[in-house]
Every structure is written in C-alpha cells, then in structure tokens.
Design a protein with these regions (language model features):
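A short acidic/glycine-rich loop-to-helix N-cap element
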Residues: 127-140
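Glycine-rich, aromatic-bearing surface loops/beta-hairpins
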Residues: 142, 146-150, 164-169
C-alpha cells in the first residue's frame, strides 16, 4: 500500500497522493451505477427498490447495487418456454452455458403465470471493499458482453424462441 512507497521530494509525494486517490476504491451505489450508465448514453429507468432497468430488443437488464457486498447485473432474455419441450431446450442451454462459459451464470425461472419459463443470466462482482472506476468500467463491459453474447448464441441455437425483430417489435412466427 501507500505505507511502503518511498517519497522523493514534495512534488512526487503530491503526485503519488493524487494518483492513489484517483485509483482508490469507493463504495458502489445505485447513484454510481446511474452515473456510469449516463456516461455511456445507456437509456435506463428506475425499477423496484434501487434497481436500474435497461431494455434492449431481446432482453431486460437489471443493475442491482442494493447489496453492500455484491453488485449484480441480471438480464432476462425475451425468449419464453411455453411447452415442456421448450422448457427442456432452455434447460439444456442453461446447463451448457454454466459448464462451458466463465460467465454469465444462467438459470430458468418460472414466469408469473407459473406455466411458462424465462431464461435469466447474471454476473456478480464482490464490492465489499468498493470498486475503482476502472474496475466498475471493466465489470460493465465484461458482464454486458458476456450476457449479450450468450443471448445472441441462444437466438442462433433456438430460433423458434425469437418472436421479435432487431428493433424489438413482436413478429408472428
């Protein structure tokens, strides 16, 4: 840490202090995620109790900074399993994702009606000690690209689930 550094002259000391403060970890909060998304021109809205939602044509992304220990990016893919066969297809893709990819973690989740299922993918990072801006930027880029890549692959593997176009408009199958 800073204790071990050797100080040479006042200007070096001042510069070192400034560099350390720029690279310092700070707590992750919903406001900090808001600033991050705004800085990247991401159009988002408030979702329930401190979550921020971002909609893409094929998914809904949810940023959750309410847990002081973990920052989570969770996304629900727009494809829905409406039959037992489709449930099986989703479950196979989830198992393949979780056994062959470093991220995201995927799972099948029942929808409100209890008869249909959606697919959720999430990436988490431990934030107990806070994150530097570089770490936060890196988590944003890595988690978004891992989840978006997984969903793009799903749409190739399971074209029967895709009932929307590239603008997110519903299309009949």
């Amino acid at each position: 840490g800073a204790d071990a550094s050797v100080t040479v002259g006042v200007s070096d000391s001042v510069r070192l202090t400034r560099e350390l403060s720029v690279a310092a970890s700070s707590p992750v909060s919903t406001d900090r995620i808001r600033d991050l998304l705004r800085s990247r021109d991401v159009r988002f809205g408030d979702y329930n109790e401190g979550e921020l939602a971002y909609l893409t044509p094929n998914a809904a992304f949810f940023w959750n900074a309410t847990n002081p220990q973990i920052l989570q990016l969770r996304a629900q893919w727009r494809g829905i399993a409406r039959t037992p066969e489709q449930f099986g297809e989703l479950a196979r893709e989830v198992a393949a994702c979780n056994s062959t990819r470093t991220g995201p973690k995927a799972y099948v989740a029942p929808l409100e009606d209890g008869t249909q299922y959606g697919l959720i993918a999430e990436c988490n990072v431990v934030v107990m000690s806070g994150l530097t801006q570089a770490q936060l930027d890196n988590f944003f880029e890595t988690s978004m690209s891992m989840i978006m890549g997984f969903f793009a692959d799903l749409e190739v593997t399971l074209p029967g689930f895709v009932d929307w176009d590239s603008q997110g408009r519903e299309v009949s199958l």
